[in-house]
Amino acid sequence: MPRRTSFGILKAMRLRQRVDYVAVQSDGMKLHGRHVLALARRHPGTGPHGRLGLTVTKKVGNAVVRNRIKRLLREWLRLHGWVPAGWDMVLVAKDSAARQLHPDDFAPDLLRILRQLS
């Protein structure tokens, strides 16, 4: 069984290698939201769940802000539904994400993105 990490997210549920991020970026489709850009790619070998990668660039803010955005996105996905099975998805935070202080501020974007993938 895969080893658990913090927040109850299994390692098998995360994109961890650069080659996975590059594959999603080159072969995937783009779904634009107000505060996040989602890059998604079909990957049937992921098991009973999808895999997620998060990217928050330095133009969004300093390290404290970037880490907070990643925590908020992870928490919202953990509580409201993960990436659908058979998909690899990378969420890229836009500049406007720095002004979002609550996980539910990302809800409209993430709900629409997850609906399109299902």
Segments the model singles out, each with a brief description of its role:
Residues 1-118:
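Positively charged, solvent-exposed patches that mediate nucleic-acid binding
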